[in-house]
Amino acid sequence: MPIDSLPPLREVINTYGLQAHKSLGQNFLFDLNLTSKIAHQAGNIEGKPVIEVGPGPGGLTRALLAKGAIVTAIERDERCIPALLEIEKHYPQKLKIICNDALKQDFSKLFEISPEKPRIIANLPYNIGTQLLLNWLLAEPWPPFYESMTLMFQREVAQRITAKPQSAHYGRLSVLTGWRTIAKIAFDVPPQAFIPAPKITSSVVHIIPRTQPLTCSAQKLSFVTKTAFGQRRKMLRQNLKTLGGEVLLEKAGIDETRRAETLEISEFVTLANLVI
């Protein structure tokens, strides 16, 4: 059943010649049941501010607007703007379109004077999804400018985001996510839901910021985790050699023969707080 009276997405794509560009990490989401499910996962968004990154032809955008959200859409691909403007006509005063590279966008300033924090809800372009997430996780000050994030990633990336210590997917991204937020995989999305269909399954991840994460410099924790996971199979005394190696680990009370994937987030925080 249509969620609005706008033309079907396939028709929109044909009208505006919006073939997905691999160089932009684009995979357009066509399944209206799934776009509505993503919007629903973010909670009650009626009358609430929402940031969407990479709306493309506007499939998820329409689902967000249909649920009453006030959407700010960041789209780098100028080809998509006319299609998004057609949606804006259908939802006056509800959709703001910004043509910009999301990696260059200062998101915190978009809602500086707003009484409510926005929710970030997006089918992120595959080629910038991880970097965008890191930018939002390491944002200062904390608590951040957003209330929550409901984001689609490649399944493997989603597993890395939510992984626990001692697991195959546990790494730097897991630590930085778990330090400042609570993240869970909400549901998977099959390849056939997209045009073009990717070769892998995707997953929607719901992320809620912690109000009081363990005290630590984001910059230092980012650096320590990057160094510790640099060569996964090596012991920490080797990987952390440039940061003090055995001396640093002894101060932290951590066995020098352990590997990075065995450390709890709190232990990484201890290491980061000891780094000068």
Swiss-Prot record:
UniProtKB keywords: Cytoplasm, Methyltransferase, RNA-binding, rRNA processing, S-adenosyl-L-methionine, Transferase
Binding residue positions for S-adenosyl-L-methionine: N27, L29, G54, E75, D101, N123
Location within or outside the cell: Cytoplasm
PROSITE patterns: RRNA_A_DIMETH, SAM_RNA_A_N6_MT
Stored SUPFAM superfamilies: S-adenosyl-L-methionine-dependent methyltransferases
Catalytic reactions on record: adenosine(1518)/adenosine(1519) in 16S rRNA + 4 S-adenosyl-L-methionine = N(6)-dimethyladenosine(1518)/N(6)-dimethyladenosine(1519) in 16S rRNA + 4 S-adenosyl-L-homocysteine + 4 H(+)
Record GO cellular component, one term: cytosol
Top-tier EC class: transferase
InterPro entries given in the database record: KsgA/Erm, rRNA_Ade_diMease-like_C, rRNA_Ade_Mease_Trfase_CS, rRNA_Ade_methylase_Trfase_N, rRNA_adenine_dimethylase, SAM-dependent_MTases_sf
Molecular function terms, GO-annotated: 16S rRNA (adenine(1518)-N(6)/adenine(1519)-N(6))-dimethyltransferase activity; RNA binding
Main location: cytoplasm
Enzyme Commission numbers on file: 2.1.1.182
Function comment: Specifically dimethylates two adjacent adenosines (A1518 and A1519) in the loop of a conserved hairpin near the 3'-end of 16S rRNA in the 30S particle. May play a critical role in biogenesis of 30S subunits.
Family to which this protein belongs: Belongs to the class I-like SAM-binding methyltransferase superfamily. rRNA adenine N(6)-methyltransferase family. RsmA subfamily.
Official protein name in the record: Ribosomal RNA small subunit methyltransferase A
Lineage: Bacteria, Pseudomonadati, Pseudomonadota, Alphaproteobacteria, Hyphomicrobiales
Annotated gene: rsmA
